[in-house]
Amino acid sequence: MHYRRLGHSGLFVSELCLGTMTFGGSDDMWGHIGKLQQEEADGLLKTALDAGINFIDTANIYATGKSEEILGHALKNLGVPREDVVIATKVHGPMGEGPNARGSSRGHILDQAKASLKRLQLDHIDLYQIHGFDPATPIEETLEALDTLVRQGLVRYLGLSNWAAWQIVKAVGITQARHLAPIVSLQAYYTLAGRDLEREVVPALLSEGVGLMVWSPLAGGFLSGKYDREGTTAEGRRVTFDFPPIDKDRAYDAIEVMRNIAAEKGCTVPQVALAWLLHQRVVSSVIVGAKRVDQLTDNIGATEIQLSEEDLTALDAVTKLPEEYPGWMIERQGEYRAHLMQER
């Protein structure tokens, strides 16, 4: 297992992060994702820790708090030293019926941070992330609330999730202008089956020194090796929960190339998908969730896969985004003086 800086911070995290969205679901949306209870969660966490994973991600909304509770108990059950793990959680989603029981207002953030700490049985959160953009709350209010948590010692680092490029850059600018605790990470959807992030968000992250944590790297299981143009196995998650949306024809093209690469390297299709992400400069960590230990073990094997330039070119040929304005115009006009930068 290798460790990478989270953005431009001094925090180093494992290149794979254990996702816990499969913890604690019942007969609702979360149950379609996973219903792991304590003993199963303990087993997954132990497997992750034994492999060198030090980064674990959850959210207050996952199974309406149950995921955090199970993770907290798992850390205790395994006797994990606090300094050995980086615990990330998120706030934004609805945790009650009222209008103030959701979103990114100061009150909701401060209340939910304390609630998450209680469920996790911790005295601080290593990375606290705003789970989505709240159009009803000024960005300044959100960032001031996060800064308060850092100054109180309840939170160490701050991140965002599912924000647009302009929102991220604006937030970074506000923290700099007001001398607030900085934004060090973005958690976002990025995969060979969906590279939309590359248009605006990836350049913004590289420009501002914000690290990328990837969620759903296998496109909701579509790149798990269970799917092809001939159909799917009955255990595929998308049979009951078809999310995130993808262009399936393009994804099938990618799967065909991935199968060839996997056959040549003696690895699996999901390992190729994860390895491709680990070859992307913007990525700090890739979040991998699982329902079984063998799935997690297979994902961990991706850290040993080296893709050649030929492999990367073949994958790019079937998954790259079509050119759109203003991207193609920026590239064209940038050529006027690009050679001057190359000569330095």
For each feature predicted by the language model, list its residue ranges.
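Terminal-tail/helix-coil boundary detector
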Residues: 1-2, 42, 231-264, 279-283, ...
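N-terminal binding-site loop/beta-alpha segment at the start of enzyme catalytic domains
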Residues: 1-85, 151
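Conserved, mostly hydrophobic/aromatic
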Residues: 6, 18, 41, 56, ...
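Structural preference for beta-strand elements that scaffold enzyme active sites
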Residues: 13-17, 54-55, 84-88, 124-127, ...
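Glycine/proline-rich, positively charged
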Residues: 27-28, 33, 94-196, 200
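Generic structural signal for well-ordered alpha-helices
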Residues: 45, 68, 72-75, 113-117, ...
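Aromatic-lined glycan-binding groove of carbohydrate-active enzymes
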Residues: 197-235, 268
